[in-house]
Regions:
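Surface-exposed ligand/attachment interfaces on beta-rich extracellular proteins
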Residues: 1-32, 39-54, 66-110, 126-128
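Residues within well-ordered beta-strands of beta-sheet-rich folds
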Residues: 35-37, 116
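Edge beta-strands of jelly-roll/beta-sandwich modules across compartments, strongly enriched
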Residues: 109-117
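Compact beta-sheet-dominated globular domain cores
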Residues: 56-62
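Short beta-strand-to-coil "C-cap" segments at the C-terminal boundary of structured domains/repeats
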Residues: 117-125
């Protein structure tokens, strides 16, 4: 997933496709472990210093009910290293089987974000 933002929120896109928002669709009646490795690299902006960065690894679980409702448990958010000012990372879920990676840059800071998302999914035919 990839995206660039300056002082605003963004949902990351697949392979740099900025036309459609990338949302990861999860199957109903499933439990998943997620692992998200994400990097943010400052490319400028009136308040940004080129080369500032942020790296995180986030892990947790996602229980998806038959209705599409998701219970997200974030059990590990590891700061792997950072320098200067970049922004914030959040993981979002909806009530329609959707999981997404969202980032925001600090005010007047331009940041390129990149994430690798791994999902380990166990699905059943029994309604949860």
């Amino acid at each position: 997933l990839y995206g660039e933002t300056t002082g605003s929120d963004i949902t990351l896109y697949t392979q740099g496709d900025d036309v459609k928002q990338e949302q990861i669709y999860l199957p109903s009646n499933s439990i998943s472990i997620y692992e998200v490795c994400i990097t943010g690299l400052c490319t400028g902006g009136s308040s940004g210093i080129v080369g500032d960065y942020k790296t995180n690894r986030i892990m947790g679980s996602l229980l998806v009910e038959n209705s599409g409702g998701i219970t997200k448990t974030e059990s590990l958010d590891t700061d792997l290293g950072n320098s200067g000012t970049t922004g914030n990372i959040s993981l979002d879920v909806s009530t329609s089987n959707i999981f997404s990676v969202q980032c925001s840059a600090s005010a007047n800071v331009s940041v390129n974000w990149s994430a690798v998302v791994k999902l380990y999914i166990n699905q059943t035919k029994v309604e949860i």
